[in-house]
Regions:
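Glycine- and other small-residue-rich loops at beta-strand/loop junctions that grip anionic moieties
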Residues: 1, 26, 62, 89, ...
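PLP-dependent aminotransferase class I/II
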Residues: 1-19, 26-33
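Glycine-rich beta-alpha junction loops
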Residues: 5, 16, 37, 65-67, ...
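Structural signal for hydrophobic packing residues in well-ordered secondary-structure cores
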Residues: 16-23, 41, 45, 81, ...
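Conserved PLP-dependent catalytic core of the aminotransferase class-I/II
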Residues: 20-73, 79
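Conserved C-terminal alpha-helix-loop-beta "cap" of PLP-dependent enzymes
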Residues: 59-116
Length: 147
């Protein structure tokens, strides 16, 4: 089906080799950043980490803020330049609470108060601290009844 794109194939092989070589360092960095973010968010009263604290993807934080509608929180975060989601990537925009969160034992109200944050090794500690501060302020604002 034609001539193979040898330069692209070679480039892909080089990129995969580099990604594989960087995987241990990138994973360690993500774990450190995830821990930093998780600690800061769990300092907010009425906040709960969903799932096992250790057995999760290195760049995944799934957290519930009691009494805060995630969709409203997402609007405030978007205005502040913070990217987050109220559910899995494949269910973004769904009205029903996440069946996965319900299976983990969350109530429908808790599932609708849950935020998913992802990060990678390119994120900085400063970005994590900024995101945590913005999320903290937005959660407090919503709990105080200010929209």
């Amino acid at each position: 089906a034609g001539t193979e794109n040898v330069p692209a194939i070679a480039g892909l092989a080089a990129a995969l080799a580099q990604a594989d070589a960087n995987l241990p360092a990138n994973t360690a960095r993500c774990l450190d950043l995830r821990q930093r973010l998780t600690e800061r968010l769990l300092a907010i009263p009425g906040t709960h980490l969903n799932g096992d604290a250790a057995q999760r993807l290195p760049g995944n934080v799934n957290i519930t803020f009691d009494g805060v509608e995630a969709e409203t929180l997402l609007l405030l975060l978007d205005e502040a330049g913070i990217c987050a989601s109220a559910g899995s990537a494949c269910s973004a925009g769904a009205v029903e609470p996440s069946h996965v969160l319900l299976a983990l034992g969350l109530t429908p109200a808790q599932a609708k108060s849950t935020l998913r944050l992802t990060l990678d090794a390119a994120n900085t500690a400063e970005e994590i601290d900024t995101a945590a501060a913005v999320i903290t302020a937005c959660v407090q604002r919503l709990r105080d009844g200010v929209r």
